[in-house]
A protein has these predicted regions:
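RNA-contacting regions in translation and RNA-metabolism proteins
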Residues: 2-245
Length: 245
């Protein structure tokens, strides 16, 4: 049997996929949830990206895990997940009130329609050592304090592995580590990270540490076990997901 000719420019190399995007709908939900008129779609999407960047910069140091945005016709809700909610809320809720005002000002500056009902929810992350975003910031914080990078990643990965539900972790640093003239990468890994398994609950985050001799890139993967679907209840239209015990 004659085989079809192979194209010369055919690219059979594998592609790198973000672990979060790889599990959308299966295990993860979108961080921006809304429907919009086609004419307003670009405005809303651009607004979400710019507001999220603004908040990530403004709230750096507050151990933020994620920023979620929900919109309806009359209401807009921001959900900020953090391991230290007290830093955001402040005394008698003054910090949360000020942050709410700042978000509305930013929306006005971006020419986004002011919602009739605006809500800001601050949710506590109960297991921060199992959250990749918080762990990545902890590493960046240690590096920016001029601590030895090997000690930082070794100490933190041991903390991560003792956290509830964690079965594997991987940390990669890249840049002029220790002030070296030539940039390189350093990696440390514990347990397993099954990136190709859809049911594997893998959290991932990129972060930067700004040092006097340059920027060090940080990548963190945390494997929190597999998630299996329960049997579908005929009375329920949705399928609930529960962690494998």
């Amino acid at each position: 049997m004659d085989l079809p000719p192979v194209e010369k420019n055919q690219n059979n190399m594998s592609k790198i996929v973000h672990p979060y995007a790889h599990r959308l709908i299966i295990l993860r939900d979108w961080k921006s949830r809304w429907f919009a008129d086609p004419k307003k779609y670009v405005t809303y999407l651009k607004g979400d990206v710019l507001i999220r960047q603004y908040l990530e910069k403004k709230l750096r140091g507050m151990y933020i895990s994620s920023i979620e945005i929900e919109r309806s016709r009359k209401a807009t809700r921001f959900i900020i997940r953090t391991s230290r909610p007290g830093l955001l809320i402040g005394r008698s809720g003054e910090g949360a009130t000020k942050l709410k005002e700042d978000i509305l000002k930013k929306m006005d500056k971006l020419k986004l329609a002011k919602p009739e009902d605006f809500k800001l929810e601050i949710v506590e992350v109960s297991n921060p050592e199992a959250d990749a975003a918080i762990v990545a910031y902890m590493i960046a914080e240690g590096l920016e304090k001029r601590m030895p990078y090997r000690r930082v990643i070794k100490t933190i990965i041991e903390k991560v592995m003792t956290a509830r539900g964690v079965e594997g972790a991987r940390i990669v640093l890249g840049g002029r580590l220790g002030g070296a003239d030539i940039a390189r990468t350093e990696e440390i890994k514990r347990g397993s990270i099954p990136l190709q398994t859809f049911r594997a609950d893998i959290d991932f985050k990129r972060e930067r540490a700004t040092l006097s001799y340059g920027v060090v890139g940080i990548k963190v993967w945390i494997y929190r076990g597999d998630i299996f679907a329960k049997k579908i209840d005929p009375k329920s239209r949705s399928q609930k997901l529960t962690p494998n015990s």
